[in-house]
């Protein structure tokens, strides 16, 4: 379960762009002031600025863009003009008529995107991945919610994840991410405590993926496990070389008097969905989880600084890499360090050398079977003491080629094609049939009517409608998981191997993977997906959401919604719908140039 955090400082005032000239630092400050309609005159600031002054996050490309932006600002350019000149390949036309506040958000997001990583073409296949695990001695593993899903802990951004559920279960939340926003928590901790029991430690058993990481450590291969999760399952597994990037429930702190206690002291309150109170001052107790708006701390940055020059393999397991600064780790190492992604989906903003897509535990199982020895023994030991799903493969899956997969798809379609009725020699009294296309569209329209006529189960109807709409829009798309049984995986491209559980489809025409994007109406937001919304392997330069904003499309959607929906003061005090920008501690664009200056420090 991943949360973003970064240090924020500064204040904003009212709705114009100013330059504040100082003798020091040499780079002048950029000051953008915001005022938002519908807030009863109350001002607030919001920014994507999350680049910490720690040197490991520096990038020549990012620094060059930031300096160019600052230079243009000094010359009197607006944020929109800076976007056009610094990022000419970015289509900014859809933002042109939006507010300066939106322009600043887009500019900040573009400036803080990590540089595009170039794939190493030496490493591509599943067997290449196994060889890397076998030979590398300083493996850095970055884990997200995907490693804990099989333990019964929900992830955040999948279609059935925490954020999707929060929208329906807590309609008063201005945005699902507000539950982990420190300012919202201070004002109203009840929603967090209503939910916290679902992820409170002590209720779950570590997964195969956790034990795999422990086995890497035991065999002397693990450099460090950076986890974005707060479930403490790494400690339960016995992993020593772990950094809990976003904290955990192991300790708690009173928000009033600062008294610290053991996390288990609030167990009863959490399980009873009660707000835990301090025994000394009766203040609200907050678990030592890094909420949005809180700093990760020096220890995290110290470890990354030490590890980035030692690592010889990076493995990302079950993470969307959407929250900084953790998402920047794969981009701070030497360009020749191979990288593997194990996830349900491909990530449009991350070019891994090898992509293994599907349920994390299923993929890890196959890797362990291939490695053999203590890794295969670990799987056998795990299966002996943990109840597994009957569908879980007990042996290494059969790897099939793309052509073999296409043959399976072709056979499936032949089996489903109805046998045509024999033609009658007598003239027909019926009217002429429509064209095949018209007939198909008519049948599809009837299917939509059938699926949308009943409102007994909205969730099922939505899911069924999604499937029908996908068939109408993309009849050439095939669900890979539907075509694979649990005993097979497919090398769908040179560098992508797909296992059961992958949340993607296969385009029979382009022979590429396509991310499953659920249909939504105009009042729903895109909080789903633990990764991408584009075709892996296509040009990924435009989709690079590394901050809490999943994409610039969210900015457009939120700006339109802002004009359509009146938000009361309480809702305005926290996160905007879909934006997922830092709103917790006051921060304004004045900090923008200061961060540039900080990053310039060698």
From Swiss-Prot:
One of its GO terms (cellular component) is chromosome, telomeric region. Gene3D superfamilies: SIR2/SIRT2 'Small Domain, TPP-binding domain. Residues 119-374 form the Deacetylase sirtuin-type domain. The keyword Nucleotide-binding does not apply. The keyword Kinase does not apply. It comes from the Eukaryota. Signal peptide: none annotated. Zn(2+) binds at residues 254, 257, 278, 281. Binds 1 zinc ion per subunit. Its EC number is 2.3.1.286. The active site is at 246 (proton acceptor). Residues 46-57 have a biased composition (Polar residues). NAD-dependent deacetylase. Required for a reduction of the 'Lys-16' acetylation of histone H4 (H4K16ac) on dosage-compensated X chromosomes in hermaphrodites. Functions upstream of daf-16 in the insulin-like signaling pathway, promoting daf-16 mediated transcriptional activation and increased life-span. May also regulate life-span independently of daf-16 by modulating the transcription of genes involved in the stress response of the endoplasmic reticulum (ER). Acts upstream of the nicotinic acid metabolism pathway, which may be linked to the regulation of longevity. Belongs to the sirtuin family. Class I subfamily. This is NAD-dependent protein deacetylase sir-2.1. It comes from Caenorhabditis briggsae. The gene is sir-2.1.
């Amino acid at each position: 379960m991943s949360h973003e955090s970064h240090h924020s400082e500064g204040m904003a005032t009212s709705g114009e762009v100013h330059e504040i000239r100082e003798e020091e630092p040499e780079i002048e400050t950029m000051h953008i002031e915001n005022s938002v309609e519908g807030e009863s005159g109350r001002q607030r600031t919001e920014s994507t600025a999350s680049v910490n002054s720690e040197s490991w996050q520096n990038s020549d490309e990012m620094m060059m863009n930031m300096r160019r932006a600052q230079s243009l600002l000094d010359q009197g350019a607006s944020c929109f003009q800076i976007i056009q000149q610094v990022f000419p390949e970015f289509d900014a036309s859809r933002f042109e008529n939006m507010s300066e506040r939106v322009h600043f958000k887009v500019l900040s997001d573009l400036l803080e995107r990590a540089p595009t990583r170039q794939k190493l073409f030496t490493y591509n296949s599943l067997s290449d991945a196994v060889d890397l695990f076998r030979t590398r001695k300083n493996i850095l593993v970055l884990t997200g919610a995907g490693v804990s899903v099989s333990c019964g802990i929900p992830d955040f951004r999948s279609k059935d994840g925490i954020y999707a559920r929060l929208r329906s279960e807590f309609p008063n939340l201005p945005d699902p991410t507000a539950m982990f926003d420190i300012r919202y928590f201070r004002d109203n901790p009840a929603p967090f405590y209503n939910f916290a029991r679902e992820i409170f430690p002590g209720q779950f058993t570590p997964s195969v993926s956790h034990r795999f990481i422990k086995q890497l450590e035991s065999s002397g291969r693990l450099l460090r496990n950076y986890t974005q999760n707060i479930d403490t399952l790494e400690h339960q597994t016995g992993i020593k070389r772990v950094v809990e990037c976003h904290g955990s429930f192991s300790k708690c702190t009173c928000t009033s008097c600062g008294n610290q206690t053991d996390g288990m002291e609030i167990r009863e309150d959490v399980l009873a969905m009660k707000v835990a109170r301090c025994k000394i001052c009766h203040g609200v107790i907050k678990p030592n989880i890094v909420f949005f708006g809180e700093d990760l701390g020096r220890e995290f940055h110290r470890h990354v600084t030490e590890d980035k020059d030692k690592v010889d393999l990076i493995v990302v397991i079950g993470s969307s890499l959407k929250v900084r600064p953790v998402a920047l780790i794969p981009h701070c190492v030497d360009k020749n360090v191979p990288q593997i992604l194990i996830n349900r989906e491909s990530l449009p903003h991350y070019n891994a050398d090898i992509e293994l897509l599907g349920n994390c535990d299923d993929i890890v199982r196959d890797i362990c079977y291939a490695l053999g020895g203590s890794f295969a023994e670990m799987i056998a030991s795990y299966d002996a003491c943990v109840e597994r799903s009957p569908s879980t493969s007990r042996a290494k899956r059969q790897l099939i080629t793309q052509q073999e997969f296409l043959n399976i798809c072709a056979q499936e379609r032949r089996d489903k094609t109805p046998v045509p009725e024999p033609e009658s020699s007598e003239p027909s009294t019926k009217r002429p049939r429509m064209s095949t296309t018209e007939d198909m569209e008519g049948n599809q329209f009837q299917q939509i009517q059938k699926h949308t006529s009943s409102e007994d189960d909205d969730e099922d109807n939505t899911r069924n409608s999604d499937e029908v709409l996908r068939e109408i829009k993309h009849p050439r798309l095939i669900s890979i998981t539907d075509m694979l049984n649990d005993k097979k995986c497919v090398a769908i491209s040179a560098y992508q191997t797909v296992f059961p559980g992958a949340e993607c489809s296969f385009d029979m025409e382009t022979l590429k993977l396509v991310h499953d994007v659920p249909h939504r109406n105009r009042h729903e937001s895109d909080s789903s997906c633990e990764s991408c919304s584009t075709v892996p392997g296509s040009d990924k330069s435009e989709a690079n959401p590394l901050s809490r904003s999943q994409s610039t499309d969210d900015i457009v959607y939120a700006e339109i919604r802002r004009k359509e929906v009146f938000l009361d003061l309480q809702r305005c005090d926290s996160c905007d719908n879909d934006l997922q920008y830092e709103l917790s501690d006051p921060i304004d664009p004045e900090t923008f140039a200061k961060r540039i200056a900080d990053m310039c420090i060698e």
